[in-house]
Amino acid sequence: PWLAGLSALCLLAGLYLAFSTDGDYQQGNTVRIMYVHVPAAWLSMMCYTVMALSAIGTLVWRHPLADVSHKSAAPIGAAFTLIALITGSLWGKPMWGTWWVWDARLTSVFILFLMYLGLIAFNKRWTTRQRRRVSVRC
């Protein structure tokens, strides 16, 4: 219960800061989208790290919870990566004049999104734990 209260307090503080701060002198009010975009991008990378550590735990120690953690982190990471891609393009349109620029960072986040989708497809396709371990090794 105290963790839920702390989460609600942080959410309220973030909402207050997002709506009460002034716009940037160059970006105007479009800078406010960074309050959503940056945490989503960080969480997408964090889910990828959790999946990598879980894959190591599955391959080395063959712990069943590592396999569950690996399988559970993929949809969460895909959702946050999609949020980061959408909010990034919403920010990029007024700043760059286009929705998408083939920058290395943008392209790597898009490839990360495709990797998440591929891993989700592997997990949906193979239901036995042994075959999922093979997909982790790939």
Predicted feature locations:
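Hydrophobic cores of alpha-helical transmembrane segments in multi-pass integral membrane proteins
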Residues: P1-G23, G28-N29, M34-W96, V101-C138
